[in-house]
Amino acid sequence: MKLRNPKAPIRNDRKAQRSFHKMLSLKAQAKLALTIQDRLELGLLSNNFIRKKLQFVDGYCYLKFLRCAERKTAARNLGSDPSLGLMKRKLVPSQYHSWQSNYTLLVTKSSKLTFAHVNRALGGQKLAEVPANCCIGSTICPFLSVPGDHSSYLVNQLPYMNGYCYLKLIRRTCRFNAVVTLGPWPLATDFFDYIIHRNLNKDLGLFKCNLENTINGSFCHIVEADPGSQNCIFPLPQDCRIGGSISEVVKTLGPDKEMIERDAVTEIKKEIAIVRKYNPYHHSSKQQSALESYGIGSDPYAVRSHTHAAEKAIENKLLDIVGMNLRRRSVITMLWQKRNKAHLMGRSNCKDVYVNTIMEAKDLVRYDQFSFGLPSVATSTAFIGDALHHMTPESVFDLFERSPNLMVLHATIVIPPETLLKCRSSNPELYSLRYYDDKFVYIPEGHAGGSYVHEVKNSNWLAISHIQRGGKFLTVKRLETLAAHHYFVIVKGKVETDSIRVFQSPSQVELLDIFADRQSNVRCSLDHAFAIKMERYVHSLKRLELADVTAKTRQLLSSEELLQYSPTDLVKIDNYFYFLAHTSRFNSSEELIGSGFFESLVSPLKQWFSEICEKFLGKSNFHKTLEALEWKVINYDVKTVIYDMSKPWEKLHWKSENNLLSFDLDSNDNPTSLVDNTDCEASYSESTKFDYELVQVEDDFIDIRIPGIDIPIYDSEYLASEEPVEVEESPIPEVLPEIEDNLSDSMSIDGWMSQSLKTFLPEHDDKVLSILEKFGVSKYGQVVGKNLILPITDFKSVQFEKIGQDEFTESLQDRGFGFVSYTPDAERVAVAATDLEHGQGVLITSDEAGELFKKAMPMSVYTCVILGAGGAGKTTFVEKFVKDNPKSFTVVTPLSVLKKEWQRKGAKNVFTYETALKRSLKKPANEYVILDDFTRFPAGWIELYMSLNTKSKYIVIGDSRQADSHSMSGAFANALVPAIDLFAPLSPFYLNWTWRMTRPVANALGHVSWKLPESGKPILSVSSEVPKDCVVLAPSTTLKVGVETVNDKAFTYTSAQGATFDKVAILIDDNITRVCGDKAVYTALSRSKGEIVFVSTVTGPDTFEKVKCTPFLRTFVELVREYELNQPKVREPEEDFVDDVTPVTSQPKVSEEFLIEELNKNSVEKFDREIFRADLGHTDAVKEIGRVTEQIPRQQRSDEALNLVTLDKRVHHATVEENLDELARKKALGNILWTNFKEQYYSGLESVMVDQDLLVSCRAEITKTYLSKTEALLKGGQLRQSPDFDKFKIADFLKTQWVRKTEKYGLPIKAGQTVTSFMQETVMATGTLSRYMRRMFDKLCTNPNVYLHREKTEQDFSTWVKNGWNFSGHATINDCEAFDASQDGAFVEFERLHAEFLGVPRELIDFYVDTKIKSYIWRGTISVMRLSGEGPTYDFNTWANMAFMATKYSIPSVAMTAYSGDDFACDQVLSVKPAFKELECRFKLKEKRFLKSQGRGSYADFCGMIITPNGVIKNPRKLYLSLKSHDEIGTIDKAIVNYYNDLRTLISLGDNIFSALDATETEFFAGCLNVVHDYILRGSNYEGHQNLTLFKKPRTIKWRVERDETRDCLIHMIIQDRKFIRNLLEGVEQTCDNKPNSNLIFRGMTNGYQKRAKFNQLLNRQDEYLDKVLHKSAGQNALRRLTATLDDTQDSTVAEQSAV
């Protein structure tokens, strides 16, 4: 069967194709117009008439209608054939005006033609643009008579201009040619020229025009001038109306009425022909009505009879429905189906395969060909015709197990739904039912000869939704039900299906049991209407006798209905209603209406007491009546169930990895011993009884690796079994049993035991030993660690066919291989041929592909499959026969490289697969065809080649673990399953050894190898650069192209398959390699015969850590590390040491006591700071560790009290409805925020379209960021990665942290910060949204003076400040209260508008809004607010801050503004907008403004940084308390480097620091230096500091002041000087005596000390400050002696100030 791409153009009919394109080009010429009156009148007719008939009757109105808009616009909006409703919606204006008062008709003549113009009357309104040369004729003519010349014009020209004649002309001539010539809607001039051309020299004056006045207007009639004349040019109908009211046109159709009837008859004929296809039988009127209720028509003229015609019609109709669901060009396997029914399914010309197995005796005469035993299905789709009820779910599951290609099974079944409840037939005119114990009889239309007998349990098919065995599922879906006939489709896998199946239920009820004698109650069902009528009747008579009930029953039941009941049923029915008549219908309960207060209190007590009495004494008469009338309505609807066939031992799943064996446990008994067991004496045994047994039920799976590999057992549950278990235990004396040499002879082995014995004990199996001996390999495996690798694995039971014996066949059999019968899948053949026809082949043309498909004939061929590792010698023993008998062998390879390899070894007939296909057209293949490396052939190609050469025998050779082939983009073959899935089950075992790879590499891949590496040569190595001396394998085509710029010998992982190299370099990418398939990675690792070099693009000490998640590479990483550990260590040369330079500083010694007192001056006691809760007591946030640390709050998850306080304070709750109402109420505020934001940052821009490339890039960026996390973090988030984790659920917890904010230091504890964790997919989606909007904002923002502190460094911010910040006036900063909780519905609306402006896809926006509305925690749904765990938290916080500030303040265009989350800074004073005062109360967000004078100690701060003229610097106070707390806690090792980097900007200011910081801040800066200095003096053993020169001891520092080391040397110089000054102030005079020639060199020039002394003198005039700095008298004396040693060149002022 040939498949064609539906998008491919028609190839053969070139003429039709050109005409079609010409027709499309002419469509744009149409320009017609329609008046408002025309539009009004169009509404008077039905849509069906307008679409089908109007163009043949009065096409003027229809054609004019399309003219009211521009042709291109109308075509795009309406389409080529618009419906009436669509035209009215698109084109009818909202207001209508009178035609008479606004328009007039004017007829004019031109040089060529005469035109009728519709002009606007004086003073009339202009309704539409009416072209002068197009509006021919008018619906309402204002003239009572037409002048002669005008009449002549109307007679001669109008019939050909108004569209009617044009359409008639097209009907009478070739429709296609007329359309091509004129286009679908021609201009009037074009049509006139066409008419003149076709009727040259013809008399056009054979018609005349008559006018008729009616209440609806004036009409123009075209009639023949001489009715008896035979010279009519055009066969125009008499009294044809041109224009006018369409309702009148319909009434006066004239001869066209017959035309409509003829068209109706044509439609009826077509419908009858369709009905006759599946229902050619005659039926009674009741049967016809029943069939019509199921949508099955009947032929009124049918005379053919059938014993059960109606049932046969339903069966045929269901086959017609099935045929519509089957793919026409696919080959289907028909099971239990007659060939003569193929036309009912529309498959008469299809090459379907019919397989009919004998299920019952009548099948012997039903089918022309049949078989015994259910065969396998070779196609992907199969159909079972009305035989599913003969099969059990087990047999259906086995059919799928035996048929690996089978994916979809269509099946019809005949099971009446009434059998679920054993009710009588609901369709007695179609079938009747009888029940016998556990069986029922289905009698179609009362014909006993066509009856069926089934078991009642077969009705379970109606309720089965899935069939399960272990972890495998089949899904059963009901597609259609017609009476008792059902259409099911069964597919592989577990997919969603209906939880309830609804069947047509009768309007019947079952009566309640009212008598104690069960046999006296009514057991049959009654018609619901009949029961209601009887109940009303018996209660309507005052006196009722039993005879009256019997008479009424006979009156209401027809003769046919009476036959459905037995006499006993009728008697029981009469008694039921007679009993019902004598029950009371009066409610004796006390009424509530009108009762007083006292009665309303007492009445419930009375009612309660009466209910208690009824429980003991019986119900009242009224309640008896109500209970008797509680009839049960019969309903056949069923809840679907999963049919589980799993045995207890099948609960264990076996997973196959690498070369390891996988199997299911067998249900058979233990193997029977064929040799008598050795007798052993046993002592008396004691037994213990258990009442319950625990049976393990797997939760995820159990990964079994056989043999000798660890078995990771996942979480499991245990079910209790009530069967008692007796465990016996007794000692056994040492008695040595006899040991059989061959276990296969001593035991009868069934099921999986044979496989396990072959795996565990291969040395005891003669067959395995023989195979290994023939291949010349050792019978022993290799032990790697705790694992045993065997030379042969993956045993399967394969039944070989007996064929003729020759030397080659015997050689295969000696090695354990043989030929099996394989039938190529016809669908794969068709797909391969279709791909070749559409240009997927390089050497094969489309004509050759078509010829190949015609010649292909899928038939069974003999096939031998050999699977093994690369280098196992699969082709070695074949090469000898190929070389000795070249005429008997044909070798086909997927690559030219393999072809050359075969030719080098002496093979003659070797071809690539495309060449082999072309040769098959001229010459068949030889007796044996070898398909080498078959996994690289395109999918379906092997089946196509086998179908062309059916007489050859095939040897299929390959490796099941290497990569599969993938066809070009757009090929149909990409949808097919790989060939390895079809041929792997035909191989008896897997050759698990290799002679190519060295033993360490082979063992790492799970193979046995006896090739030892060469001594002194590395096997595995790691490099950061791409080598040039070997082949490089890259994980993607992009990386391959990049590698080719360095090394032209580059391949992808899979493109190198089939080739081997002495040395291979494998490029490892952190993000790409880990997502490569196992087969691709295995292919790359198995290409080398020697060394493998891993080239890593992952930087850092954790190289390869994340790649360990990839199979195979995990083992190789360990090998690489072992190899590196075994290499000799190369000792690095010691560095030369130089003398220390004299250090420089500008900071004095500061007392630590003073700094701590300054920090703690406002602190309070611990329990005065803690929060107290009555239920949980105090919080535990104050940790008494050190004097600074105890003032810093410690928030941790274990603090339950603080956790609840945080949830109460930070998280607010609401319902989803309240959140929706919040969004609706705040929508206007959101628009205001967006308007101000857009004006400030998108001035003059319009919304943009989505940038798909950027969106994909952002998604990839988010994914890469997520995968860059450590493996521990990735595994820690498994719960949120699960699809079972609700996308709106939030896992919330308290963030564990030290709160080192200066504003919270030493103050009472406040609520902590929550961390909210969404489902990972939700974070990825919203993160993509945020990243896309971030990139688009950076691209489109029109404000050059705004700075967003994201993806920027402190140096970037400092550069921005220096380039434009204005320090001449005051600056503005702000502080927001509850910033996250205040972002309500107004900000969500702002975010939605912002996203729409940037072109974000609608579904992504809707998903984000849903997360804001529906997110919930364990407490309930969260109200609309900002949450910390959202993907766009930072960006949306920043934009919310920007929008609010732009709404509240007037921000000048020249103002420099900086934003980061809720932080804000501006270099100008901002004024509040007057309009904001009215809006302020409607915003939850409250913001306070602060002004900074931008002088010393009063600069604007932003994100913990101070904005100064010299750039930005860190706040020294915050730095000191953070450093000191780290020092006290003991975590300074990890933090010292970061704080050192923060101090560098302060250090680099030099003396300028005094102009930026006040006195207190300067002292805190000196305190930071002191902490760093003391840490370095103690020395650092932290592993992260080993390579940093900063943390070496001062005397071992290598002082080379180079460009890159200047910053490091600076801090060392400061530290050394601090040490010298400290010794000096403590009175250690030896420091100066030991260095008599050394003077302190201060920063800058020699009078730097003078500057410092003068500056300190101005700031510290009080003696208290000097006492704190120089707190020892010895220190003062030492300082005076030091100043005395200054140079004599300094003046007295310097000396005096130095003394100070």
UniProtKB/Swiss-Prot annotation:
Domain (+)RNA virus helicase C-terminal: 992-1128
One GO molecular-function entry: RNA helicase activity
Enzyme Commission (EC) number: 2.7.7.48, 3.6.4.13
Reaction equations catalysed: RNA(n) + a ribonucleoside 5'-triphosphate = RNA(n+1) + diphosphate; ATP + H2O = ADP + phosphate + H(+)
Occurrences of domain (+)RNA virus helicase ATP-binding (ranges): 842-991
Binding positions (ATP): 868-875
Residues in RdRp catalytic domain copies: 1369-1480
Boundaries of every Alphavirus-like MT domain copy: 299-462
PROSITE patterns: ALPHAVIRUS_MT, PSRV_HELICASE
GO biological process, one term: mRNA modification
Keywords associated with the record: ATP-binding, Helicase, Hydrolase, Multifunctional enzyme, Nucleotide-binding, Nucleotidyltransferase, RNA-directed RNA polymerase, Transferase, Viral RNA replication
Family classification: Belongs to the potexvirus/carlavirus RNA replication protein family.
Functional description taken from the UniProt entry: RNA replication. The protein possibly functions as an ATP-binding helicase.
Extra information: The sclerotinia sclerotiorum debilitation-associated virus contains only a single ORF.
Name recorded for this polypeptide: RNA replication protein
